[in-house]
C-alpha cells in the first residue's frame, strides 16, 4: 500500500478520537510516573533503597499487566477498555490520600504497574482497531500518540507540582484520566452501534 493511501486514514474522525484518547490515557500514567521517584522520596519518605525496589516492582508488574491485558482484550475488549480509566482514577485517588504511607504506596505502585502494563496493550489495540487496514501506519501513530501524551502530561503535572506541591502530582493524572473517559466512550458507542447494525 502506498504512503498516500495510508495517509488517507487521517481523514477519519474516529481515528482522531482514538488518538486523543490514547494521548490522554498514556499521559495520565506517565505524566505522574515522570515524578514517581521524587514522590516516593519526598511524600512517601522511602529511603533510596526502597525507592529502587518500588520502581523495580513497578517494572515487573508491567509484565504481568501485559499478560492480563492480552487475555481481557481477546475476551471482552470493550468492557475492559471502558472500565480501565475508572480503575486508574480510583487508584490515583487512593494514592492522593494514602501515598504518604510507606508500605501502602508500595502496594499502590504494584497495582499501578499492572494497570500501566495493561494500558500499553489498550492503547495499541484502540488505534489498531480504527486503522486495521494500515497496521504499520497505525503502529507509528500509536508510538507518536503515546510520546505526545507523555510530554504534555509531564508538563501539566509539573505545573500541578509547582502550584500545589509534589504530593498533588496525581491530580494531573486524574485530570487526564477523566478527560480520556469521554473519548473512549465515544469510540465504544460508535463500535457498539456499528456491531448492532451489522447483526440486523
Where are these regions (language model features)?
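Juxtamembrane intracellular "pre-TM" segments in multi-pass secondary transporters
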Residues: 1-19
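Extracytoplasmic gate region of multi-pass secondary transporters
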Residues: 14-56, 60, 77
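Juxtamembrane helix-start elements in MFS-like secondary transporters
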Residues: 46-55, 101, 105, 135-139
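Residue-level signature of mid-helix packing/kink "hotspots" within the transmembrane helices
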Residues: 59-67, 150-151
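Helix-to-loop junctions at the C-terminal end of transmembrane segments
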Residues: 64-77, 161-162
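C-terminal transmembrane helical hairpin of 12-TM major facilitator-type secondary transporters
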Residues: 77-123
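A late C-terminal transmembrane helix in Major Facilitator Superfamily
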Residues: 129-168, 172-176
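Multi-pass alpha-helical transporter architecture, strongest
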Residues: 174-200
Amino acid at each position: 500500500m502506498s504512503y498516500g493511501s495510508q495517509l488517507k486514514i487521517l481523514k477519519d474522525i474516529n481515528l482522531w478520537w482514538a488518538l486523543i484518547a490514547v494521548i490522554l490515557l498514556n499521559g495520565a500514567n506517565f505524566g505522574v510516573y515522570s515524578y514517581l521517584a521524587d514522590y516516593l522520596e519526598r511524600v512517601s519518605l522511602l529511603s533510596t533503597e526502597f525507592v529502587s525496589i518500588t520502581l523495580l516492582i513497578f517494572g515487573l508488574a508491567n509484565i504481568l499487566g501485559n499478560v492480563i491485558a492480552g487475555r481481557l482484550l481477546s475476551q471482552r475488549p470493550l468492557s475492559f477498555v471502558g472500565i480501565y480509566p475508572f480503575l486508574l482514577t480510583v487508584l490515583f485517588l487512593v494514592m492522593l490520600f494514602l501515598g504518604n504511607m510507606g508500605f501502602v504506596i508500595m502496594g499502590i505502585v504494584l497495582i499501578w504497574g499492572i494497570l500501566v502494563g495493561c494500558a500499553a496493550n489498550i492503547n495499541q489495540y484502540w488505534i489498531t482497531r480504527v486503522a486495521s487496514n494500515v497496521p504499520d501506519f497505525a503502529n507509528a501513530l500509536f508510538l507518536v500518540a503515546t510520546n505526545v501524551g507523555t510530554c504534555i502530561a509531564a508538563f501539566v503535572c509539573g505545573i500541578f507540582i509547582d502550584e500545589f506541591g509534589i504530593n498533588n502530582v496525581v491530580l494531573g493524572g486524574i485530570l487526564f484520566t477523566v478527560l480520556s473517559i469521554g473519548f473512549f466512550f465515544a469510540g465504544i458507542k460508535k463500535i457498539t452501534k456499528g456491531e448492532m447494525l451489522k447483526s440486523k
